[in-house]
């Protein structure tokens, strides 16, 4: 149909990170438009994949945000300094690394709330938690810089040149 319409089919491009392994089976397909695979996020983790219907684990998450506990006064609840302005309101919510039972809610602009029934340790005000972001695209747009870290050492500071450039 596309050939009959006179379209150039040298490049037949589409799909994305979540469908990269499906699109390659489409006849004539030449190019997959993956981009988020670089970072991954909670949305991709939860969609499932061709190899694992429960979780998309073809690529590991690399984009995280460090948040600080600012209140621990209530049993089963922590308050952090990362709300919707740091993590967006996208679903699913952020995943706390090392704490699979934590439920993160970034519903407030400036603060996040974590509820849990069990945790791996006792947390105090000032403790840091690393969270996997809900949706990488809008989260990157919220920051001026990205820190490239390897083995707990900052190797590079990268400016986000397109930050806030939505039109």
Region locations from a protein language model:
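Active-site anion/phosphate-binding pocket segments in diverse small-molecule metabolic enzymes
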Residues: 1-167
């Amino acid at each position: 149909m596309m050939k009959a319409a006179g379209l150039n089919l040298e490049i037949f491009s589409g799909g994305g990170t979540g469908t990269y392994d499906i699109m390659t089976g489409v006849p004539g397909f030449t190019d997959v438009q993956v981009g988020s695979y670089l970072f991954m996020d909670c949305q991709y983790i939860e969609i499932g994949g061709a190899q694992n219907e429960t979780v998309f684990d073809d690529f590991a998450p690399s984009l995280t945000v460090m948040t600080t506990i600012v209140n621990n006064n209530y049993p089963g609840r922590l308050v952090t300094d990362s709300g919707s302005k740091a993590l967006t309101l996208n679903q699913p919510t952020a995943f706390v690394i090392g704490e699979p039972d934590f439920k993160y809610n970034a519903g407030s602009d400036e603060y996040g709330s974590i509820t849990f029934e069990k945790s791996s340790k006792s947390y105090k005000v000032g403790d840091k938690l690393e969270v996997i972001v809900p949706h990488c695209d809008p989260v990157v747009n919220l920051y001026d810089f990205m820190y490239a870290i390897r083995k707990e050492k900052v190797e590079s500071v990268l400016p986000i040149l397109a930050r806030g450039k939505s039109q």
